[in-house]
Regions:
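Sec-dependent N-terminal signal peptides
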Residues: 4-13
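Chymotrypsin/trypsin-fold serine protease catalytic domain
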Residues: 24-28, 102-104, 109, 129-215, ...
Length: 297
């Protein structure tokens, strides 16, 4: 119940700042706190670098979780700037490798510092990226970042490819606000920027991408700050950060905006210079199609 009430407050407080990003006021309000709808439970241990961001003053991991992130270096977690804006390092703990929030027995690692992108805009959610420094290095293997480059230096296109999004967000908003204890995943196609620009006032920048379904797919993003990952050479790499979406309704699936990881490698390397980066793919600039779990209507 604590988490339910907290979630409703977060959704309500997020709406005014972003409501103007929707071209048609009759459309559902934009919200920063995103959801996984129509996805499936993730297998235990499948995504070891996933991280749950927790309120430090709440001893219950399930109710304390407010955003997600990923371990990209032994001491650094990548997340969305809007997740940690206005928060102190002392107010956050991180559960790396969490799966079932009600049965998490690992360490709740205190945070040493928070690094928000200096050009982050809380209204447009441009540059929605931040780094959280752990006070104790993690023993878990970090995820590799997608470089967004090909062997011939032609930027590869994510358009039409499936990204897998992870989180503990709302699993059902049609009849009730149901937050799952267990990590969930969903596969979403990356769509053309113009498709999202038909909905949002603030256009999709090159430092972002748009993904999701339309009409009847119950498709939303994962928890804010969580990862959108793709496969490169058989390995999962981090391609985007869950940033902004619109409220999910019973018969509508909405496209969400993601911060494009490859656009911020310089920012990331300021603090995590040895982060692993990959993504050199064959000439032609395309990623292989991946047979992933699809949403059900």
């Amino acid at each position: 119940m604590t988490r339910l009430l907290l979630a409703l407050l977060l959704v309500w407080s997020a709406q005014p700042a972003l409501a103007l990003d929707i071209k048609d006021p009759a459309l559902a309000p934009v919200e920063e706190t995103s959801k996984i709808l129509g996805g499936v439970q993730a297998a235990p241990g499948a995504w070891p670098w996933i991280a749950a961001l927790l309120y430090a003053n709440d001893s219950n991991v399930f109710s304390a979780q407010f955003c997600s992130g990923v371990l990209i270096d032994k001491s650094w977690v990548l997340t969305a700037a809007h997740c940690v804006q206005g928060m102190s390092a002392q107010g956050i703990q991180v559960a790396v490798g969490a799966w079932d929030l009600t049965k998490f027995t690992g360490s709740r690692t205190p945070v040493r510092s928070i690094r928000i992108h200096p050009q982050f805009s809380s209204t447009s959610l441009y540059n929605d990226i931040a780094l959280v420094e752990l006070s104790v290095p993690s023993s878990i293997q970090p995820i590799t970042l997608f470089s967004g480059e090909s062997v011939d230096n032609t930027p590869p296109s994510l358009l039409g490819k499936l990204v897998t999004v992870l989180g503990w967000g709302v699993a059902d908003s049609t009849t009730s606000w149901y937050y799952p204890e267990i990590l969930r995943q969903v596969s979403l196609p990356v769509v053309a920027d113009s498709t999202c620009n038909d909905i949002y006032i603030n256009p999709v920048l090159p430092s972002q991408f748009c993904a999701g379904y339309w009409e009847g797919k119950d498709a939303c993003e994962g928890d804010s700050g969580g990862p959108a990952v793709v496969q490169v050479d058989g390995h999962w790499v981090h391609a985007g950060i869950v940033s902004a979406g619109v409220s999910c309704q019973e018969y509508f699936g909405w496209y969400g905006k993601y911060t494009r990881t490859s656009a911020y490698l310089s920012f990331i390397r300021q603090y995590a210079p040895y982060v692993a980066v990959t993504g050199k793919i064959p000439a032609g600039g395309t990623l292989p199609a991946v047979n992933l779990l699809l949403l059900t209507p």
